[in-house]
Amino acid sequence: PKFPEFNADKQIVLEDEKIKELIKKTIFACSTDEARPLFTGILVELQDGKITFVGTNTHRLSIKTMEQESSEAMSMIIPSRVLSEIARNLTSELPQEVKLSLLNNQIMVQIDKVVIVSRLIEGKFPDYRRVIPPAFNIKTLFNVKELAGAVERVALFSSDGDYSIIKVSVGNNE
């Protein structure tokens, strides 16, 4: 069957590597709880020559920003399932363009000969900028391998829940 006409109001063209990176760095933080549909998607913002993907389930928050030329500012919430499908279809070794076209409350994604049409998630995404403090009182440096090893050891004692919390105490000159 042929797709219906989709005369887009707005359109964004992204390089495949860029959108893969944006998806990879944010999708894990999305909720899977359909009772709160707003958090099952990724907030996509275009403004000031940058594109930002934001994912949260209210316990985790992930933000990834990259340079992106855009003629106008826009904001939308794309379902995480659509973004997973985009990532799954970006398998070619050759560079590909991903075209996102918006019309009312729908998005059409074109990757080579693949076309995905979906509804956007309606609602107002929480202001994630207010969650992050403008300045931090404590700064610390650590060895990533040592921290990863410590987290793996502590994880053995944590429950299998989604939100295992590790408390880190930092003393003076430690």
Tell me the role of every PLM-derived stretch.
Residues P1-E174:
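Structural preference for solvent-exposed beta-strand-turn elements
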